[in-house]
Each structure stands twice: as structure tokens, then as C-alpha cells.
A protein has these predicted regions:
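Short, small-residue-biased leader/transition segments that mark boundaries at the very start
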Residues: 1-8, 181
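Charged/polar, solvent-exposed surface patches and flexible loops
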Residues: 3, 56, 60, 64, ...
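Extreme N-terminal leader/anchor segments
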Residues: 6-74, 83, 87, 118-124
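Alpha-helical bundle segments that constitute or directly flank the non-heme di-iron/ferroxidase center
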Residues: 8, 85-115, 132-138
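Active-site-adjacent bridging/hinge elements
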Residues: 69-82, 106-108, 169-178
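Long, hydrophobic, well-ordered secondary-structure blocks that form the structural core
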Residues: 111-177
Length: 181
């Protein structure tokens, strides 16, 4: 495993993360690269892969693209109005937790993994993954905007909920450990 974690020499144009650059001007044979900690990425080539599974996963994720606004929530609004106060609490708490989780998943993979990524197909897969998490979060926002007259009343309480904060800690601590290596 020792060679897997060795970094390439750093040029002055590279960032604080050893080996990372926005665009490597040297040709890199990504078919022979490790998934992580290889040479910095160059041209995003999607014609040859070391791991074609990541490209298939990227294509599959892109096929799931949708916009929350494309779905009518008129029935949901009426159904929500019929819930008991306890059911509304569970419904809202779940949405708040999902928004927190998707907020993390919408940014953490890029912050934690992409700086060390050595394969364009993996970089693309993680980028699309983050994008899909943002779509999820937007869908929860769309639901809240449709069932509450003042959505800010809900959003403003997310960071005041100790249950959500403790769950966020369990999700974010590993990402933060990697980011702060």
C-alpha cells in the first residue's frame, strides 16, 4: 500500500493539497492510475476508462435527473392538512433531517474525495452524485414551500434541533477527518 499513497511532485501552480492542480498539462494515462493519490488529472477523457463501472453509474445518475417543480403537490398539501400534529411533527422533522443530510452529501464528497481523485470517470461520478444530492435537497425545499405558508419558519429551526445536529455530527466527522489531513 505504500506506493498507493505516495504523491507526485508538486509544481508551483498547484494548490495546498499536495499534487492537486486545476489542469495538469502533462499527459496522464488514467487507465494505469490509482483511483486516488495518482498524478493530478489532465484532460477529462471519457473514451477510455480504468473502471467503466463509474461511467455507467454516472450515466445512470444522469438518467434520473428531474426537477422538483415538475411534480404537482396539490394533493400533498391537502393530505398534509389532514395530518395530526404529531404526524406533522414527524413529517417536518424528517424533511429537516433530509435537508441537512443532503446539504452534507451535496458538498462533502467534492471537498473530501475529489482533491485526491486520479481518474476522470470517478471525478465525474462524484460530481454528478453531489449534483443529485442538491436536487434531493431542492425537492424537500419544494415540499416545504408547498405545505407551509412561511418556509423560513422551518429552515430557521434546522440548526436549533439537537437531534439533527447530533445526527449531522455522525455523518460529517469522517468527512472532516479526511478534509483536515
Amino acid at each position: 500500500l505504500g506506493d498507493v499513497y505516495k504523491r507526485q511532485p508538486v509544481s508551483p501552480a498547484q494548490s495546498d493539497i499536495t499534487g492537486m492542480t486545476v489542469f495538469n498539462k502533462k499527459a496522464v494515462d488514467t487507465a494505469k492510475q490509482y483511483m486516488f493519490f495518482g498524478a493530478p488529472l489532465s484532460v477529462q477523457r471519457y473514451d477510455s476508462y480504468r473502471y467503466p463501472t463509474f461511467d455507467r453509474l454516472t450515466q445512470q445518475q444522469l438518467g434520473y435527473f428531474w426537477r422538483p417543480e415538475e411534480v404537482s403537490l396539490q394533493k400533498d398539501r391537502a393530505d398534509y392538512a389532514q395530518l395530526t400534529e404529531q404526524q406533522k411533527h414527524i413529517f417536518t422533522s424528517n424533511l429537516k433531517y433530509q435537508i441537512m443530510l443532503d446539504s452534507v452529501q451535496g458538498r462533502a464528497p467534492g471537498m473530501a474525495f475529489i482533491p485526491f481523485c486520479s481518474l476522470p470517470e470517478l471525478e465525474a461520478c462524484m460530481t454528478v452524485w453531489q449534483f443529485m444530492e442538491m436536487i434531493h435537497s431542492r425537492s424537500y425545499t419544494y415540499i416545504i414551500k408547498n405545505v407551509y405558508s412561511n418556509p423560513s419558519d422551518i429552515f430557521d429551526t434546522i440548526l436549533e434541533d439537537n437531534n439533527i445536529l447530533s445526527r449531522a455530527e455522525s455523518v460529517t466527522k469522517s468527512y472532516l477527518s479526511l478534509i483536515h489531513i
